[in-house]
Amino acid sequence: MKTKFIIFSLFAALMTSCVDYNTDSGFPKEEENPNFEQNEVRLWVTNQNKVYKLTELPIDYNDEISKLVIRINPSITYQTIDGFGGGMTGSSAYLFTQMSTEARSKALHSLFDPKEGIGLEHIRLSIGASDFSMGLYTYCDKAGIENFAVPELDKRDLIPVLKEILAINPNIKFIASPWSAPAWMKDSGLLNKGKLKGEEVYDDFATYFVKYIQAMKAEGITIQAITLQNEAMFESNVHPSMIMSAEEQATIIGQYLGPKLRKEGLPTEIYVLDHNFDIYDYALTVLKNKEANEYIAGTAFHGYAGTPSVLSNLTKAFPDKKIYMTELSGGEWNEKDEMKTLFYYLNDMAFPMIANGGNNFMMFNLALNSQHGPLTPGGEFCKDCRGVLTIDGDEVLPELEYYLLGHFGKIIRTGAKRIEANLQGMFPEDIKIMAFLNPDGTRALLAVNNGGTTENITIKDESTGKKLVYKLAPSSVISLLLK
């Protein structure tokens, strides 16, 4: 009996020693972490069976112990986010102006209101006609830069809509791009195809941007950024387009546009390329030009060829430059299974774009009609493109791209920082995550499960120690906002 007592005493002492060691370490056991309160968490869900499409739901707390843990750490920060959004093309603006006042207000609130809508805060504009416009025009159709003037179509459609949007959300940022220089500056003498005549028009071309920025400012619209040419290596015979080599772009920025913006005291940022990932070496060429580099804020990309993985080369070579996604269109070519397309957008485009240093994410047309237009007169390109909204009269249909952008815009504000987010445990490869710290201190988490099983996951905030256990359904996307 005495022997048994001694053995039991030794075992108890060892167990006490282990407990004391864990307590002294300052790290409580996982199950001892406090839970988030209901009023500290907001959740939006989209799932395969379409029961939920960016639907806000209460958190269904459970106390099951999970071996899968998502840890977010707001003390480790990465790049700043400039917003999520899309293109307000001439066609999009026209469709909004054709709506009744009440219907238009509701549609615009659904896009730009951070409380009632999805909180988009980044809009791309075309300087003159694009492939989705109500006419063929620039801001200086008559030869001579002294003839610069805001086009009547933009006075009628675009500018009133932009002012209405700013009244809804004053935090909107605008980036503007020409699809073509005025025809009199080009060797083709046309808005479609061709290139600039050469150095003889570089000064006027640079002044064209300065006058545009000043004209929009006079309307109460601040242009945060510009690119020199939409899809600089693409030439179309049926809609406005223009070829511009990397060397030419560097010359114009370094010797003409950059100095002019600085002289005029305009803080508008310059982004280069504005074309697909597969020709990222174009951006490298421009950035390596020392004369141009000092005026360049970053690079802009489209998602029609190549992959965002190449962006790691840019962030390594030029860590001080931003990276924008300025265009990606949805369309009839997408999978008929909407969740497959949503997972493609997230896993192949948005997540790797941001993980590799991207500062925003934008789709193309914010609105088109059910006939995939209106196209620019004479236009034959992208007849099956889809807008973020489909608008016919006062009828509005949010498309898949609306829910994609909403999963970001609902929880991430301009000025947020991407933060460290890690998966701990034997997570399936089908689960992807991304986390952010908002300027107001709230934390945002996106999680994607494109697998076939429900996963019980503990989500832990390292800054507060708080946690919640959540059942992540198969084939679903969630957006969490944590206070």
Report each predicted region and the residues it spans.
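C-terminal motif of bacterial Sec signal peptides marking the signal peptidase cleavage site
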Residues: 16-17
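Substrate-binding and catalytic surfaces of secreted/luminal carbohydrate-active proteins
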Residues: 31-68, 174-176, 207-215, 219-224, ...
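Membrane-proximal, proline-rich intrinsically disordered regions
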Residues: 24-32
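N-terminal catalytic cores of secreted or lumenal carbohydrate-active enzymes
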Residues: 54-223, 255
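Sec-dependent N-terminal signal peptides
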Residues: 6-11
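Short, flexible loop/turn elements at secondary-structure junctions
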Residues: 74-76, 85-92, 127-129, 178-180, ...
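Positively charged n-region of N-terminal signal peptides that target proteins for export
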Residues: 1-5, 119
